């Protein structure tokens, strides 16, 4: 019997015991396990480990992300009924019962080696499942430390430790694929190669959509507010989130003013020569490399040898683009504080441009709009985008990376795994 088979065997034994828990006891387990990362000292340690071992992101932002995303998820799960009868329609006589799926294989990325695993763990436990984490190789140490905290919290409520396990070191593709094949459900967050592997493993699977979020700034927008929100989102955790804006489409009527507002918010617009220097480091034969992924602007400026006089003090960089697709790699996802900027004559042209970009990369995820704060214009344009673009969410007048995956300021549920729909 392989090591993965042994892990699955232990998970099934633990899950069978857990399946008999009442709703009250399940909720106690979820609340206890959430403290594995909500406790400030543990959270700080995990944030520091994540940045140290992966080389990605920012410690303070990961601390905030770990706390906010976990607290929001606990809030969302708190009142959800997941044991026994969950719905009954006396008119049709139909009664719905909640049943666990069994063992969940949770594939997690290096960009969020603490926040994404705990998110998947809590969702699985809420539904009386066991879960096995397949972390990225770089995120293994962070995940292992998280599971030590999780097991301590399971001990406190006398729940089986084997409800939550992870693949052992070294993390290999073969072990991850075996886990996906043997589990009852796969929930995959990570590279598109991992998502494709999840969908073709023969086990029911949920996979995230490819990121490449674009946002429109139209002639009705509060430009200062829009620029500040884009900067907040673009710089958070050095843009590790797939919900971070990768590009902005600015309408002609406000183009120069919007660029000025973005510069005031800390952006630095690079000239063609610096754009080429950035390109030469970021891409290899049109494919994104990891050289600048989730790095600070200062590191990016140094590695790309940027010559702009403000490059060293930038909060984020901007590059102008006119095309899209493989021949315009800046039109794709960059996972770094680099914002691609397009100019469009009007709203309809902006919408059509985004549709073209998403046909290259980003379909199924989300789009942003900065426009009037209320009224027919805002509602009409949001409706237009929702009706015509291949996205799951339209985020209006908000910092995209903060809002898309759930926020205390909007009604969206909290998640670190944005599905791509059908």
Language-model regions, residue ranges each:
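Short, flexible turn/loop "capping" segments at secondary-structure junctions
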Residues: 7-9, 207-209, 237-242, 328-335, ...
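Conserved C-terminal structural/oligomerization subdomain of aldehyde/semialdehyde dehydrogenase
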Residues: 19, 28, 307-422
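Flexible, glycine/charged-enriched surface loops at secondary-structure junctions
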Residues: 20-25, 45-47, 160-163, 236-242, ...
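Rossmann-like NAD(P) dinucleotide-binding subdomain of oxidoreductase/dehydrogenase enzymes
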Residues: 82-225
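Terminal low-complexity tails and localization/encapsulation signals of metabolic enzymes
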Residues: 62, 84-88, 92-101, 297, ...
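N-terminal Rossmann-like NAD(P)+-binding subdomain of aldehyde/semialdehyde dehydrogenases
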Residues: 1-95, 123, 264
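Structural signal for hydrophobic packing residues in well-ordered secondary-structure cores
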Residues: 12-15, 19-22, 30-41, 50, ...
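ALDH superfamily catalytic-core signature
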Residues: 118, 126, 195-325, 350-352
